[in-house]
Amino acid sequence: MSLVDLLRMGSTTPVSSGDKESHVNIIEKTDEEIRAAAEPLWRDLVKHSNEGAYGEFVKNFSSSMALAMDQVTVGHQFANSALARNLSDDFDYLGIIRRGEYVTVLYRQRSSKRAGEWLGRLVLGYENGKIRIFGASIF
């Protein structure tokens, strides 16, 4: 789905990966380390949302989040959401919220076609030793 509607399915509570073998906790990283990991992921989401590229859009999702993303529904969102297909590369980092085994990175996101600003939310955590996306949305 698009960053606008579909990823609200990511809800305010991240989808659990069930990964108990790796106890790396992202909240132990510094803000700078988290931001360095998050920004390329956010840029990729913006780019692939604009392109309507489902496979690329979900490539950094946690496995359970990727499974929750139905390709038909995502394609429909890409086709029908003007915001999801016109996100600007112009965004501002706002901050990080830590909780449990996840961090939420907040962005001020703009559109290349619509006036105004939106709040972007990217939820990150570890799965199988790699930083993955457990939720994302634009409000």
Model-identified regions with their sequence ranges:
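Functionally constrained cores in energy, signaling, and assembly domains
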Residues: 30, 42, 49, 60, ...
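Short, low-complexity N-terminal intrinsically disordered segments enriched in polar/charged residues
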Residues: 2-51
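Alpha-helical protein-protein interaction elements
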Residues: 34, 46-49, 53, 70, ...
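Short, charge-rich amphipathic segments
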Residues: 2-16, 51-58, 85-88, 112-117
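Short solvent-exposed beta->alpha transition segments
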Residues: 40, 55-96
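Surface-exposed, charged secondary-structure patches
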Residues: 76-126, 135-139
